[in-house]
Amino acid sequence: MKKLLSGFLAIMLAFTLTGCGKETHELQIGQVLGAAHGTKCFTVTTVVLEGETIVDVVIDEFQYMDSTTTTGVPNSENFKTTEGYHLVSKVVNNETYSANMASKGGATMEIAAGYKAIEDFCIGKTAADLEGVDAVSGATLVDTAGYVAEVAKAAKAAAETEAVTYEGSIEAGALKVVLGAAHGTKCFTLTAAYAVEGTVVLSYIDEFQYMDPTTTVGVPNAENFASYVTDGTHLVSKRVNNETYSNNMATKGGATMKLADGYNAIQNFCNGSAVADLEGVDAVSGCTLVDTAGYIAEIVKAAK
């Protein structure tokens, strides 16, 4: 009887320990700017990575288009662009852009569907797996190879970032990217969040603003956008130009924190938090950015 009881207890203990075990995932996020499709637009590609494997991807592109038939990026009405044109997201303007592709180039696939096919193809692969890939089943976009190369580049960028640990299944995880206006009227915010069942696991913030081309690095293809900008500036990523932008903040506003450090502090605060817990938060310890509440609200928006 003792032997039987001992064996039963051992089995139950093993079962209990197995049942208590949780999946553990080490995840990273990266975002890159590129020129996957010609000279009239720039690409923003965001990747979530586990180890070397791509977990999720979002691709979008930005181009100047007719302001009477498209929706501009947030604050576009305040940007000094050529009359009749403004900067747009192709994903946001999927139907209009796709109709143009169909009428002018005979395209049979909507741009967003093409992006999605490429994103789905890349998920589960490594950057090395994507090297040299020039075609994707189900994607008829002419520059498919360029988009795949941008995903590989974003995966490599993600590998250089600090990982976060998530305990539990990520089967329901989803990466979303949203546009907003977290900081005034002179720029627009691009915010990514990877969320699992109401929890922000990873987040990423960047902003885009028109600045002096002699002291900053423009977005890819910025030199080809000059005819659309009327005040001699060009569009830049604030992260890419962190040093210059932060120096301006310090000189003009007395800022004591670099912009990218502020973004990162907000991201670190939000990562691991329930979306509901972030609603209405307006301050983050260690972050002195004046519009902290706005950035958190954008992460919440992306997570939803």
Functional labels for PLM-detected ranges:
Residues 16-19:
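C-terminal motif of bacterial Sec signal peptides marking the signal peptidase cleavage site
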Residues 1-11:
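Positively charged n-region of N-terminal signal peptides that target proteins for export
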Residues 6, 21-25:
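Short, surface-exposed loop and linker segments with low hydrophobicity and enrichment for Pro/Ser/Thr
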Residues 24-29, 33-173, 181-304:
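Active-site- and interface-proximal helix/loop "cap" or "latch" segments in soluble metabolic
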